[in-house]
Amino acid sequence: MLTAIRKNGLILAVFACVSTGLVALTYALTAEQIQQQEQKQLLQVLNQVIPHKYHDNPLAQACTLVNDDKLGTAKPMHAYLAQRDGQPTAIAIETIAPDGYNGEIKLIVGIANNGTVLGVRVLAHQETPGLGDKIDLRISNWVLGFNGQQVTADNQDDWKVRKDGGQFDQFTGATITPRAVVLAVKKAVEYVNQHQQQLHNQPNPCEGQ
């Protein structure tokens, strides 16, 4: 009886070791593939918010981490630093709209050195399908309305949805979501405008973050 129990225990132990080994092997074989896919997706987004003509450096690697209340979170946000012929040209910065209808909305905003918005994309959100999800370019082209915009002392009131007297469309039945995104983009542009030189001079510690 005792021998049988020991035998069964040994079999289970061997099975557990083999299973663990297979899981580890599978992870090792797929980790690089997953990393390559994530890098590919990151590059696609970066090239949407900072067009190719603005950079000839490896944008995904030219990254620094920043903390500021204007970015909507206490967590470090990634900023990607574009250069052309060795000269700074633009910055793509992550930011959070903390007051979306269903929670935080994570964005990335591309901003040229003259303060012009080059592109905005939604990285993550939980907004209501058919209503607030129109911030996603896969659903509507609303987010393209930021292209070419600037934030200046004279146009502060324009950076609101139309319902609040601004220039950006709200969605039928969903004003909270676009209002949150407009404010988050505005603050991100203001942050970059104020810290542009500092950002371009920061080291690039993002690898593995």
UniProtKB/Swiss-Prot annotation:
GO terms for biological process: electron transport chain. Residues 30-209 are periplasmic. Residues 1-8 are cytoplasmic. It is a single-pass membrane protein. GO terms for molecular function: electron transfer activity; FMN binding. It holds the Pfam family FMN_bind. GO terms for cellular component: plasma membrane. Its cofactor is FMN. The modification FMN phosphoryl threonine is found at T175. Its EC number is 7.-.-.-. InterPro entries: FMN-bd, Ion_transpt_RnfG/RsxG. The chain crosses the membrane at residues 9-29. It is found in: Cell inner membrane. It is an enzyme of class 7 (translocase). Keywords: Cell inner membrane, Cell membrane, Electron transport, Flavoprotein, FMN, Membrane, Phosphoprotein, Translocase, Transmembrane, Transmembrane helix, Transport. The complex is composed of six subunits: RnfA, RnfB, RnfC, RnfD, RnfE and RnfG. Belongs to the RnfG family. Part of a membrane-bound complex that couples electron transfer with translocation of ions across the membrane. This is Ion-translocating oxidoreductase complex subunit G. The gene is rnfG.
